[in-house]
Amino acid sequence: MEQYKRILLKEFDSRQKVITELTNLEAILNLPKGTELYISDIHGEFAAFDYILRSCAGILNEKIKDCFGDSLSEVHKDRLSALVSYPELVLGEETKGQDWYQETIPQLLNLLAFAGAKYSRSKVRKALPPQYAYIIEELLYSDTALADKKSYFENILTYVIELREAVPFILGLSRSIRQLLIDHLHVVGDIFDRGVGSAQVIDELQHFHSLDIQWGNHDIIWMGAFFGSKACLLNVLRIAARYGYLWDIEKDYGLNLRSLTLFADKTYQSNPKFRPILGGREQEFSEEEILQLEKVHQALSIIQFKLENQLIKRRPEFQMQDHVMLDKIDYWEESITIDDTKHALVNTCFQTINPENPSALTPEENQAVDSMLASFQSSLKMAEHMSLLMNKGSMYKIYNKHLLFHGCIPLEPSGEFQPFILNQAHYAGKELLDFFEYHIRQAAKDKEVGDDLSTDLIWYCWKGKLSPLFGKEKMTTLERYFIEDKETHKEVENSYFSYRNSEKVCQLILEEFGLFSQESRMVNGHTPVKTGKGESPIRGGGLLFVIDGGLCKAYQKKTGTAGYSLLNNSYGFQLVTHQPFQNAQKVVESPFAQTSLKKVIENVEERTLIKSTTIGQSLLAQQQELFGLLHEFYDR
């Protein structure tokens, strides 16, 4: 503590400096809080995710209308919205003349000033492109009603245009406007899954100014794979093969999958059940490439089932003996017995399975797995991306009195917290999520060891009955490949998913996490909201918001929308309903064709100030430290 005081004294070495900082903090604490955007289940759909960020989930259009009113035509406002969202595309359409720049840049400056009106000048400055910060501030705060200032403004603007800096200047202004409109981003899980653009999503998140991430079930297997879990790795690669983006991640992360493709090519034949699901990308693949993916898909699936068999036997404490599926198969008869019922197997590809020891990998399978794991773990880009997930991520987040988590809080059929029992210790509710987070961070410390308890628990997070990220009785992957009876495909949800409609249970969960404020809410992803069937994203008497982003096109027929995101500004919550995203060019041509529909859920009586937020608590603590410094050293 004494050392900390010495550091403070070095920075604030006079009474005046302490007073100045206290005054600055007080000013910041009394400003309105910034706008937060909550988004979940991106599922690798980069273009749709990028659009939500670029359009600020519909806030941009609103701000343009509020800023310019009737002074601009609707067409002009549309074009300005497109410019701020996709400046690269709009500026690249055709050569812009000096008159266009002279008209457009002042409009962008007006919009920037409007977007930053509730912030301190210091915060606005931090949002500006560093190379133009001084010029932009001069232009922002020039009173053009005065003749001299108007001339000053016009001269600077003309000089920027003549130096051919107008394009990068507009790019910078557009980014600054977007940054001021979305102050903080919450990603409530599942960056990864079916889409091809997960790497691009994380690239964008790496450069986002303020964010947090709540891990989803699909995120956790990527993390597990990087930390050394072979079972997680095979799940990651199998899903990539199934949805046709295996070669995309090979390229994105510089992976070496040659040993896998050589092994699969000579071991497996065509099997239509393993034909990749390409989701409209069929024209990008030749029949030869599709056949190769079919073979690789089979190889990855069988190796995954073997490794999972091994893991379950290695961890009897996980109580997953019923999931040792390969041991239940009669390989001569090609049938499997589940719950005393025998089922015929179809689409089989058991060439490498030894019926006497179904879990054993062949030497070639072992070589392929070791090669893939080494490649996955040695990728520099993978290391950067996993570092972001660890540094910004967690099992849950308490932020501004709200609880954010991806999957579920496991509950008993009675509605009580359901315990995970491990080595006679019970973990339930908040303790359960803390337990898994501890082990995830332990596994991250040594990625050379892939079969320790902590790393195996990451795999359990993916498909274990009491995983807060999975939330189902059982994952039926093998059944879906090889059994026609769809009854065996069913995955029974945890009781949480019915109880989350109960206000009483939602209140119980909030209190379990120490949240007793009437303002507290829960934000949950993971499950698509089937709007077409009358489901609502608002549950539990308004205490819970389910915001599965619905960006995955495969779910949009079921949901009837492209999902939801959530906004929270100083006035309260707004729910945003998204329309299916087509492409950026369509947005540029017709911005309002992609309109996001907003619903105000609740308005607070008084605007929420920074002093009432999570960041505000930190600033108040700083203020108290400075008061202590003032009284102890300067006001004695």
Curated annotation (Swiss-Prot):
Family annotation (Pfam families): FBPase_2
Record's catalysed reaction(s): beta-D-fructose 1,6-bisphosphate + H2O = beta-D-fructose 6-phosphate + phosphate
Cofactor(s) required for function per UniProt: Mn(2+)
Alphabetical UniProt keywords: Carbohydrate metabolism, Hydrolase, Manganese
Biological-process GO terms, alphabetical: gluconeogenesis
Any one GO MF annotation of this record: fructose 1,6-bisphosphate 1-phosphatase activity
Pathway assignment: Carbohydrate biosynthesis; gluconeogenesis
EC number(s) per entry: 3.1.3.11
Class of enzymatic activity (EC top level): hydrolase
Top-level taxon of the source organism: Bacteria
HAMAP family hit by this protein: FBPase_class3
UniProt record similarity statement: Belongs to the FBPase class 3 family.
Name of protein: Fructose-1,6-bisphosphatase class 3
Organism in which the protein naturally occurs: Streptococcus sanguinis (strain SK36)
